[in-house]
Amino acid sequence: INYEGKSGNGQHTKMCNQIAIAGALAGACEAMVYAKNAGLDVDVMLKSISTGAAGSAQMNNVASKAAKDDYAPGFFLKHFIKDMGIADEEASERGTRLDVLEDVLGICKKLENEGMGDLGTQVLIKHYKW
């Protein structure tokens, strides 16, 4: 447990986490789609890059589920949308542009509107016509 300082800082730290996850998740999905379209074995590619600088919990856990078309939720897309929305609002109030977060949030909202809100966040891969 880390002490984040004054009241409210823990909430802002949670928003930082969601912002970072949005980018990592989108990056993993885009890497997988590129690999598939380049004729690579996606599982082998994930093993290769997950131990290097691209490695993350999103790469190690969520991407491997997406590669298997396993959309069972570890974290619901609808809850991720809620958290990203809060982060986006907080950033806007501070005059901070978060382009990647806004893009991922928009894509996730589209997927939720298509009935995928109760699936895991790895369903983001479906945006790319996986």
Protein language model annotation of sequence segments:
Residues 1-7:
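Ligand/cofactor pocket segment of small-molecule handling proteins
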Residues 9-130:
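Helical "substrate-binding/catalytic lid" subdomain
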